[in-house]
Amino acid sequence: MVVVKSVTIDGESIFVFRNAVYIFESSSGITLELNLIVSEVVVKKYKNVENLIVEIEFEDDRIINSIMHVKILSGGLPQLNLFCALDDIQEYQDFDRVNENDSWFPNIEDGITIEEIRKVEMPNEDVGLKLNLPIDQVEWLKKQKKKSLNEIFQEMIYEFWEKQESKGF
């Protein structure tokens, strides 16, 4: 079995939580496939990209450099599926093989949660709020910079969560 040591996409090393690398055999051809559980930030970065320059380093010190297609796999955890066509599979004899008609398929989601992934890289999302506040608070909010407001709201929410947990909610 082949073990992936590191993955670099377009020159940038990415944190991989779990992976499966295998040869996929179908009626349309043979492909090298790399399924990765990554952070939501990584998925967001590559979700609209069709092709990537990928370097895969294996624990036996082999390195594969290839232009690979990318698909975002839907499911419980953030996943990328990278794949490229293969003409010669001689150098991939020790890779797992999956046939399109097989019932077995690598499951890389077992034993990891979205909470564990977010401890490594927490995504930020823009949010708009409609509030009804006293005018003095509105004026004060308008004078603040976005970075300060982000920090204030993050702190307030975390403090509120702690209070809720201590009350048993």
What residue spans do the PLM features occupy?
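Short, ordered beta-strand-loop transition motifs
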Residues: 22-31, 70-79, 123
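Short Lys/Arg-rich basic patches
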Residues: 102-135
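Short conserved beta-strand and strand-loop elements enriched in small hydrophobics
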Residues: 2-8, 48-62
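Solvent-exposed edge beta-strands and adjacent loop segments
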Residues: 1-33
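Helix-rich interaction surfaces within compact, conserved domain-sized segments
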Residues: 83-112
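Short, basic amphipathic alpha-helical segments that act as recognition/interaction helices
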Residues: 148-169
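Short, conserved charged micro-motifs
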Residues: 41-48
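Short beta-strand and beta-hairpin "edge-sheet" elements
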Residues: 57-90
